[in-house]
Amino acid sequence: EGRWEKVISQVKKGDYVFIQFGHNDEKTDSARHTDPGTTFDDNLRRFVNETRAKGGIPVLFNSIVRRNFVQPKDASIAKDARQTPGEQELPKEGSVLFDTHGAYLDSPRNVAKEMGVVFIDMNKITHDLVQGLGPVESKKLYMFVEPGKIPAFPKGREDNTHLNIYGAR
């Protein structure tokens, strides 16, 4: 997408560069997909190396939690139904957050350790926040828009991945 090139071109000595990827790397679209343990990790190493080459200070994060609440009995299902076309949706919203990131959460931690980079577990931080708020209150952090409230989303929007302005703060 060319976004990294814009960022790295502006990095100066002493700048902190916060590096967090994963949500789009999980997609099946070949233009975006990477695999944890191989191509995903290689990209993280590249970003760390390029940041250091410019005199910047890289900090690696794993992905924030998706707001996917399931019934307690479904909280440990082994696969993410979003990844298999044609499969049923996840069960009706429940009270327990379901991990959709799998091994993508480990890669930034592993690369940070390997390369001597600070790692911040944003998944744990946001998981605890969202789980603590619960299914109803946590919607206030994400892009849940009532129909007719915002011109860009005339029919409304229910987005469990992207934070709104309040959630991003």
Which residues are covered by each model-predicted region?
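Alpha-helical cap/lid subdomain in secreted, periplasmic
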Residues: 3-169
